[in-house]
Amino acid sequence: MPKVKVETRKAMRIAYIEHTGDYGAIPFDRDIERLYGWAKERKVRPGFYPLGIYYDRPATTPPEKRRSEIGIPVYGDVKGDREIKTKEVPKMKVAAISFKGPASAYPAAYDALSAWVAENGYEWSGPSIEVYSKKPEKVGGQTIMYAKIEAPIRKK
């Protein structure tokens, strides 16, 4: 099992694009390009690491109903529009693991994180957050993802 760290995630403002549907079908590259372009047009300084916020568990939610947001941190006073919205993500305590692997390995990583959360007297207290530390790469026909998976937690 990957090493789990309990961390305090700082509050941040993000610009994001909402999605409903299969997590594997999110046009990640297109969205990130649009978000950074949007920030540049508005002369807003973006953060370096894009992120995904995932509201629904694949084990309990049909693919067509899964809600998510792909976003980037933004610094400065900026308002969203019809397509790209902005919001504050509050400060929170998270259980975090580093992930490097094919997208097909995400379920096992989430299972391991969920087990750690339960075994250590915590419960999930919000949607999971994935912070992408590197652009995905194609290796041997598979897409390799680089992310920190964060589970917002609170003591039971």
Give the residues covered by each predicted segment.
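A solvent-exposed interaction/effector surface
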Residues: 1-156
